[in-house]
């Protein structure tokens, strides 16, 4: 089941639990706007290259639409649509005043020079600048993009609309980015993990963690878990996977990754098959890479974790979700567990609009407040509807968006 089918399935299950009427259900499911643009740029060698860009603006009942822009060869309309819809429910679960959007360009960033990436970003911005804005749609970084990408979008957008730092988030701090934004998704995943473990009478200290993905999210999660006394026993990235039953020295691993650009070859751990990372023995499994990685095939290989924290978007296939739940594995869903990034993006947007910057402690303290409150809200919905955490999160998000839609008179 692809990401769009799985997301639609979860939405429809939540709508059924909430008793939404069919007209309202349909209006919440269909995107507000789908944008497809062609972007042609001159390459460094003088030839022309053409790329296709997408932006799906799913819903704006609760505020400006919000979501990342990813650069990846496999970007397609269905994936962008699914991720835009997930952003709608995610911002509602976090209770921040946004709707959902997502964008992307089908390209391989590693095959393009810095100047080619800049030209591509500026052309894409030229094509969509009238459809984004501070109070309309606020992009952010995603897979294959970074603060520099956001700086280019800000600059190009400002040529048409005047200097507008709040038009994108995840910017460099020197251009109005927020302190703490780089660690926000990983830190949010830590706070989510703490909330779940506390519910079960446990703490991060002493738990054994396996983390799939050592990019921005996975590496920060590993660092913060290590600082809290958790034992990270295995990690993986695109270069390979490593394991140390006694716990990996995360600070040393950070230095190794900085020098070699991957976890492969780290001296204080032994290599393992990257395909087996999800079934390594641990207490807590954190998928922090691509979607769809936990599926029924993993079940056949016997996932051993007691808890799964979805730091990636849509990492668990619905069939695997059902099987694991029956086995007693507790899954903390992506639309709550990885909402730290968009929450701190909201803080950045607020700071830009106010023209008043927060210190990092305030950012982190506010993030913890939002994540702790979000877990309580999800649990309350679980009790109300007698459902698991995923459906608790979906019913929470869908209900908040549905209420805003009805209050604005859009349901007819």
UniProtKB/Swiss-Prot annotation:
This is Glutamate dehydrogenase. It catalyses: L-glutamate + NAD(+) + H2O = 2-oxoglutarate + NH4(+) + NADH + H(+); L-glutamate + NADP(+) + H2O = 2-oxoglutarate + NH4(+) + NADPH + H(+). It comes from Solanum lycopersicum. GO terms for biological process: glutamate catabolic process. It holds the Pfam family ELFV_dehydrog. It is found in: Mitochondrion matrix. In roots, stems, leaves and flowers but not in fruits. Its EC number is 1.4.1.3.
């Amino acid at each position: 089941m692809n990401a769009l089918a799985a997301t639609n399935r979860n939405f429809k299950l939540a709508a059924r639990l909430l008793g939404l009427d069919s007209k309202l259900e349909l209006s919440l499911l269909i995107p507000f706007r789908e944008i497809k643009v062609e972007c042609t740029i001159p390459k460094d060698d003088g030839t022309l290259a053409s790329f296709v860009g997408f932006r799906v603006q799913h819903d704006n009942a609760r505020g400006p639409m919000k979501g990342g822009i990813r650069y990846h060869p496999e970007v397609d309309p269905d994936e962008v649509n699914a991720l835009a819809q997930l952003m709608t429910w995610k911002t509602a679960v976090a209770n921040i005043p946004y709707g959902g959007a997502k964008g992307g360009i089908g390209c391989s960033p590693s095959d393009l020079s810095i100047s080619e990436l800049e030209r591509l970003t500026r052309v894409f911005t030229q094509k969509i600048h009238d459809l984004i804005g501070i109070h309309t749609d606020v992009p952010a970084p995603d897979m294959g993009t970074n603060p520099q990408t956001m700086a280019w979008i800000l600059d190009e957008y400002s040529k048409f609309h005047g200097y507008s730092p709040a038009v994108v988030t995840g910017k460099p701090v020197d251009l109005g980015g927020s302190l703490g934004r780089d660690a926000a998704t990983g830190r949010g995943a830590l706070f989510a993990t703490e909330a779940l473990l506390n519910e079960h009478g446990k703490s991060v200290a002493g738990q054994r963690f396996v983390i799939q993905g050592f990019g921005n999210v996975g590496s920060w999660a590993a660092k913060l878990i290590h600082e809290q006394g958790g034992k990270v026993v295995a990690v993986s990235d695109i270069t390979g996977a490593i394991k140390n039953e006694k716990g990996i020295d995360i600070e040393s691993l950070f230095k190794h990754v900085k020098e070699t650009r991957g976890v492969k070859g780290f001296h204080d751990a032994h290599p393992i098959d990257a395909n087996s990372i999800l079934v390594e023995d641990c207490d807590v499994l954190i998928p922090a890479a691509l979607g769809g990685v936990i599926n029924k095939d993993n079940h056949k290989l016997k996932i051993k974790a007691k808890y799964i924290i979805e730091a990636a978007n849509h990492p668990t296939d619905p069939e695997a979700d059902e099987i694991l739940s029956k086995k007693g594995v507790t899954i903390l869903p992506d639309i709550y567990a990885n909402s730290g990034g968009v929450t701190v993006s909201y803080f950045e947007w607020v700071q830009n609009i106010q023209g008043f910057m927060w210190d990092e402690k305030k950012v982190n303290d506010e993030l913890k407040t939002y994540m702790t409150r979000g877990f309580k809200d999800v649990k309350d919905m679980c009790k109300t509807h007698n459902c698991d955490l995923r459906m608790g999160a979906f019913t929470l998000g869908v209900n908040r968006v549905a209420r805003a839609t009805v209050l604005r008179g859009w349901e007819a």
